[in-house]
Amino acid sequence: MSNIFSEYRSTPRVKFIPTMLMVAIVAACTAPISKTGRRSETFDAVAATQTFASGFRHISERYIEPVSASELALEGLRGLTTIDPSLQIQHSGNRITIGSDILSPHSYTLPATNDYEGWANLTVQILLDAQNQAAHYQKTKLDKLYEAVFDGSLSHLDAFSRYASVEQAKRNREKRSGFGGIGIRFIMLENGASVSLVFPGSPASNAGLRPKDIITHADGRSLVELKRQETGSLLRGKIGSIVEVKVLRPPARIPFNLSIKRDRIVEITATHSVKNGVVNIHVTRFNNHTAQHVAQNLAQALQEVHRQLNGKAKGVILDLRSNPGGLLKQAVNVSDLFLVNGRIISTRGRHPASNHDYDAKSTDIARGLPLVVLINGRSASASEIVAAALQDHDRAVVIGSTSFGKGTVQTVITLPNKAEITLTWSRFQAPSGYFLHGLGVSPSICATRDKNSDAANVIETALWKAVQHTETVQAWHSVSTKQKRERQRLKEICPATNQLNPIDVKIAERLLKDTALYQRVKALNQAIAFIGK
């Protein structure tokens, strides 16, 4: 599931330590020499201390739950077992003893619980002692030492908090900023990459590439037998660079060459279709242009309806099934396209900067047309923000299965060594007050258990179970974030499915073609409206 995050750059704030440890650090600024006389990679102890202190401080201050510097450092030291599996740490009172098959036992005095610099100094001292004793530690690159410690520190927090090495952090920044590519989607065939979509206005489009063209070579390398990811890597590159491709255009048998200048590619995240006056907007993820893509697709679709039927559209389906999420701002902007006012989402965490309220302040571009949102078990994060906002404000009927329940925000902390920590620091709170994480959004019409039935029966079953639905909504809003088992039990009322069930669309189309039926189902949202007051 995609992470929703904001970026934060740390500024080193390291107070140096008492004289005894200071001497050890200054002496360690040169490469340590082992008993064998071999010199390791240069270990800048001052820089390492700054990096560990910065990491421990920001995790402790910003993580969504309280966590001390001592917990982080001790778990980080245990993370060194990925380098030295025999490592043993014995903790007694204010001292720890560390030893392994290759390290003689050594005892250390522990700093105060939240003395970030003290724990950073201790971590560095232990690493220096290990390097001075064992060639294995000397041979281990500094990046691997950082990774082992921070992976250990973060391992007991949550699944979305993680450390990225200097190189991985660089790739992450490039990914967040966009990438250099040619602007196509493709599938792999026996003879190369078959183009399935050319993005309008992209380098590929400008160069004359068309759907169904087959790219057989990129920069002289055959694409035959390559995996899709390998082919994608060849087509991507630095913005402004040139990729030379060889193209086969069936039914021709002789390929031709194209030189395509890579540019920043922003993936198209919304497409549309129109059927019998019903507009279907399919959103695949939330990137920097998703709200713009949704607005453009809806405008085009409404024009198509007017041309085809010479009248007004019956309604809009917003298909968020299997959408893993993306950017928080874009989730807010997409919600705002269909709302006139009111709260869209709130974020709540321990750190003051993590608390935000996002409100609608636009106009409804669908002009009040009936709206249905489709979700499934792979609809997560930003998708859940949109579904919850439109449901809570009684703007849409939600159909499908319970969503994934990825309701946290991650902040990205850049460390002094240029690595990154992605850290969970707040939770999403829906307009009606419940927290999404570990729970998700509950649909008004659950299609999970009746996927082999017809749309009319599923709708009637939902209306017949209106009282049960109200009870579920009440439980959804009263369950605590600490009650993990109860939250999981509630999710099982409408079990999540990862499939794109055709019946979801059939139910939506039936509702949008019958205004009275749509209003009857929409009345199920009143249970939420009552709780939200």
Residue ranges and their predicted role:
Residues 12-161, 477-533:
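Terminal targeting/pro-maturation regions of precursor/exported proteins
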Residues 58-66, 75, 79-86, 125-137, ...:
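Structured segments of extracytoplasmic/periplasmic soluble domains
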Residues 45, 62, 96, 108-121, ...:
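PDZ/PDZ-like domain segments forming the peptide/carboxylate-binding groove
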Residues 191-194, 216, 230-271, 424-425:
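PDZ-domain C-terminal substructure recognizer with occasional recognition of PDZ-binding tails
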Residues 176-180, 188-192, 209-210, 237-241, ...:
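Short flexible coil/turn linkers enriched for glycine and charged/polar residues
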Residues 205, 211-246, 330, 406-412:
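PDZ domains, with a preference for the canonical peptide-binding region formed by the helix
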Residues 1-12:
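N-terminal secretory signal peptides that target proteins for export/translocation
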Residues 5, 30-36, 42-56, 266-533:
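C-terminal "post-core" interaction segments
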